[in-house]
Amino acid sequence: MKYLQSTFALLTILAVSIAQGNTEKKLNVLWLIIDDQSPWHSIYGNDLVKTPHIDKLASRGVLFTRAYSESPVCSPSRSALITGSHAIRLGTHDHRSSRTKENQIFLPENFKTAPEVFRENGYETYNSGKDDYNFFYKKSDLYSIMDSKVENKLAKYGKSGQGSGDWSDIKSQKPFFGQVRVSGGKDVGDQLPDLLAKSGYPVVKASQVTVPPQYPDIYEMRYNIAMHMNSVMQTDIEIGKILSRLERDGLTDKTIIFVFADHGSDLPRSKEFCYIEGLHVPLIISAPESLEGVESGTVRDDLVSLIDVTGTALALTNQDIPESMDTRNVFDKNYKREYVFSASDRSANVIDRVRSVVGKRYHYIKNYKLDRPLFNYGHREMMAIDYPDSKYGYFAKLRSMYEDGLLNEIQATPFGDRTAEELYDLQNDPNETVNLASDKNHIAELIEMRGALAGWIEETGDKGAFKRSSKSLVEVVQRIPPHWLKSPEFRDFFDEIQSAP
């Protein structure tokens, strides 16, 4: 009997040791998610900024030059990332949706998000950044490390807010999957130049920048472009502090680091719009030397969809990518995307429907709502009208210039009538100012890109094609000032309410 007990005890100790050994061999995964930032870092060729920490990280990993977001606004993009799936497939395409009990959006039965897959494979998970997903979920299902107060306050209907948790909170020997928000282009204030100067960084001035042709060369545009460049250096400071903490805690050689933005900058034609400037994002993946496949100092120019961050994180930690996900592993030997797709639907107070496909050279955009202009008094312009001294004040200046006839044809286009199709040659026209959709010399390219987009829409069962329910409109009306709601759908909704008995 004593022999059996001793044998059992020995086997138990051995099993625990093996389990701990396997756990220790697993690498941590850290997502550093930048808000609203285009790839204007020095590693991407911008000579006006210095980003030494990001540059060093890229030198230890892989830099992707053609990564594009699923959506040009945060919550659909983040919903696609956390699910590894196209937002229009799951119905998570409208910005800040599923925030009321009456308008809950549920993922398919038995669908697992990325944090849930990590947890099932022995990881601790946390999200200290944005909790901004357009579907119903319980935070404690996704994240094992969190503040119970945050769970009670934010999880019930998947509302937007800041998460909680840190790798220092982990008491077990398990590896971690962590999400950390980096302020990027969103938290930009007048104090930023002083911060940069005190930190030994240059300060980009309005007089130094070049204004792209889609915008008028006015001080307000120069200032905002300069401040976005300064935000890039603020990002470098924040990431540098995180990397220093990893080094201090002995985690640098145990952690795969992903650095990327949810979408591009917040310039007028960037955020919320499916132009390249709103979709193109930085992407760096850095891993310990012991991990095969991630070769230090590599630069890749192939097309990458940002949702592939999810599949890559799973694959690099030897986890299977669920068949329910659209994401892929960018380091798979057979990885290749002929096209990258994106969508823009309701962004805050404005309803639209735009679909986009980026190919090796051309970018095709399909506009469905031709009864409204591109710049349709979105929330940034309404902020400028209601609060002229806000950082979005230059939106009001642009509209004033349009009304006074001071914008050229290219600059005035977003205020005028929409065209159903747009086609741009990214090689010769990176700022997308010449629409080739009606150019007979580009019929073949138009047909190719049109067909690719149609195939994606059909394959995903695009939920953005369906009419919005009254409940989804009520959800918006309850939190946004009525005078901001200028889309025809809201006008019709208000008319129905007034005419109801």
Where are these regions (language model features)?
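Long, internal low-complexity/basic segments
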Residues: 22-27, 34, 39, 63, ...
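Catalytic-site neighborhoods of secreted/periplasmic enzymes
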Residues: 80-189, 328, 334, 343-344
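Active-site segment of extracytoplasmic enzymes that catalyze sulfate/phosphate-ester chemistry
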Residues: 31, 38-113, 117-123, 464
